[in-house]
Structures are given as structure tokens and as C-alpha cells.
Amino acid sequence: MWAYESVFYQIYPLGFCGAPFENDGVLEHRINKVSEWIPHIKKLGANAIYFSPLFESDTHGYNTRDYCMLDKRLGTNEDFKNICQELHENGIKIVLDGVFNHVGRGFYQFQDVLKNRENSRYKDWFHISFEGNSNYNDGLWYEGWEGNYDLVKLNLGNEEVVQHILNAVKFWIDEFDIDGIRLDVAYCLSPEFLHRLRNYCDGLKNDFFLVGEMLHGDYNQRMNDSMLHSATNYECYKGLYSSFNSMNMFEICHSLNRQFGAENWTIYKGKHLFSFVDNHDVTRVASILSNENHLPLIYTLMFGMPGIPCVYYGSEWGEKADKSQGDQALRPSFEQPIENELFKHISKLADIKKNSTALNYGDFSTILLTNKQCVIKRCVDTETVLVCINEDENNYYANFNVSANYIDLLTNKELRVENGFEMKAYSSYILKLV
């Protein structure tokens, strides 16, 4: 599967392109901005893009009006088709956000229900009671997603609804030649629906990648051979920044050992979760870390641990934003990308990751662990890699039972390890056994 050897770049198109929050219905060809950023994305080393919602919606993209029309604030389907073609020509795969649990109030079929009530042929597309009322005083009650009544929950037990979604997926593949879908709130989608979606997609395109947004619980319930290929690793997202802020590397290593360790009981061994240090829903990593010296280190650990790394646009140069400022602060438009030292570091990590069988498929184990340091081992039969982190302000001699010659892939310098080695303050290493 191509995704297991990829580095993702996430773009939230409505924000990235500077579209107004409310859909004013005015056609603007803003999506073409993506084309201007392709050289930057390639230089970063990303070879796949995950686009947050970009189809016609009421406001933020997750309240869909039409699954088969690019949002007018972004342009036309032809615009996006050209963008997809250009991305593919540059060796970049494309994953779209599939928001299939709910739609917006502007969704045609829901508007028909509001107009025709019991006589609407779409009344069973949603969970509706004509004896109640809604927060919008519609004279009927409907189920909104987690109490958000601008997000109208679809009835995925209705065959017409499922067919409508599957037809949209086929349209995306036929029209834009996309390579995968990220399933919004996948934890709300029934296993039956995901099984149906997987079978359908497998029949449309080889190696079509499905990754689901999962927060808590056992990801295996929806990530398995008959449903999703991957799931968002929110457990390790929290563990990554918390381990640096609390100077407690035991937290992230506990999660990684629980998920991918050598013991037979580990829960995700051999699987490829979607790794990230921030995204469009959370505080940016440069803001949540209490020590800016830890910023390159957290990326080294994210790229070095098992999983598929994803970088959120703007964070590759250390852009800051706090969730308390509101969602729009997390999803801004930048005039130009910035290519600073952090960008160069992540670019090097991306190159290492894409070309390392051990980092893409290798076993995981911890060979040194203290509050402020860790050394993890990734290995396959043909390659052994050590990922080493020192989050302390002081140098540290990492003492572990290994004596061999390595090359530090971050610097391309050879290093002799004799029962360990000295790590510099605020440093990270990716050591490949020579």
C-alpha cells in the first residue's frame, strides 16, 4: 500500500485559500492557490496531500450541501480536476475528506424535507420526528451530530443514502482520480457501512486508501482487513506533546509499546496508524509545546515511530495558533510558505522516512528510557534504525548495550556507538546500522 511509505501534508482548503466563512454563493477560483504551493510541498518531502472538505457546504466544509460540486468559494470541478492532475504529475497522491455521517441544512434532500415534510420522498434519509421541533424552529425534530443542529445526521441504514454516498465516491474517482478518503468521525460510522465502503472502493481502484478519524477506544473495531486501512492516532498525538511538556518520555513510550511493542498482546502491531502533532481541530504544536527547543525533536519522534506522518500546513515552519482563539485561527491563509530551519529538518525527516524500510515497516522496541531521553529501535531483516531523543537542556550519555558503527541519517555523519553514546542537549538522531 502506497500510503504506508508516504509523508502526508494536510491542507484545509477553505482556510488555506482565504475563502469567506459563510458561503456567499459567489464563484471564486481560489483553489488554484494549491498549484502555487506544489514546489514547496515537494521540497518539504510530502508525497501525498490530505484535503479537508472542499465540496459545496454551508460554512466550514463539514456541513455539506452537494457531494459532487466543488465549493463555489474555491472554484469549479474543472479547477480541482486540473489541480489533481498537476499533483499527480508531480508524484503527489490525493486523499479527500469524506463527511458521510452528516450534512448541512443546505443539503438539497434536507431542504426538501423542510418544505414538504411528511410528503417528502427524502424524509427517511434522516432521523426525523414531525411531532417535535428543532433549535431552528422548523416545526420538526431531527438528529444533529452530537447536538450540533447545523450538522444533520444521515440515516446510513437507508439504502438510498448509502447509494448516494457510493455514487459520490465513484464520481470523485472518475472525475478527479483521487487515491483515498479520510472518513470524518469514523467512530460514528457503523462497521456495516465501512465494510460496504471498503468493498466498493476496492472494486473501483487498486490500493485505494481509507483512513478514519478515531479518537478513543479500540481502533481495530473499524481498522482491519475489511474496513479501514488506517486510523488517526489521537492517543499518541496527546502522548507526544505531553511527554515533552511534562518531561516524561515514559508516557509516549508506554503508548507506543502498548500499540506496537514486541509482545503478542500489543494491539496495533503490523498496522499503520495516521500520525500527527497537530491538525485543523487542535492547538498548533508550536503553541502547545512549552519549550520551543522541543519542536524539531517532536517531529523526529513522530517520523521515527510506527505510523504514517502527516504535517499540517503552516506548522512546517512553526506557525502558532491556539484552539481558544477559534477554529478560524487554526485554519488561516498564508501569502507565501516559509522555509526556515524547522522546514529543513522536517524535509530531511521526510526523505529519511520515505526511503527507510525499517521506519515504514519495522518492528518497534524501546532500548533506553528515562524521563528526558529515549532510544527506540525500528528494524527489519535488512535494516536497523535507532531513533534517539534528548529533550534535556544538558548533554546526556545514553548508556545501552549496543556496540556498532552507525550513520546519523540527519547529518550523514558516521558515529561509533560503544555501549551507548553522548547525546547533545535538545538533540535528536536517526542512526542507521552500517
Language model regions located:
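Hydrophobic faces of well-ordered beta-strands that scaffold small-molecule active sites
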Residues: 7-10, 49-51, 94-96, 181, ...
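Carbohydrate-interacting/catalytic domains
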Residues: 1-50, 56, 81, 86-87, ...
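Active-site clefts of carbohydrate-active enzymes
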Residues: 267-290
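Short, solvent-exposed turn/loop segments enriched in Gly/Ser/Thr/Pro and often Arg
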Residues: 12-15, 49-58, 98-107, 184-190, ...
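Active-site-proximal helices and loops of the catalytic beta/alpha 8
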Residues: 114, 184-267, 301, 320-348, ...
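Substrate-binding/active-site clefts of carbohydrate-active enzymes
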Residues: 1-7, 12-47, 54-175, 197-203
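Short catalytic-loop micro-motif centered on adjacent basic/acidic residues
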Residues: 95, 180-186, 285-286
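Short, well-ordered coil/turn segments that N-cap beta-strands
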Residues: 5, 45-47, 90-92, 177-179, ...
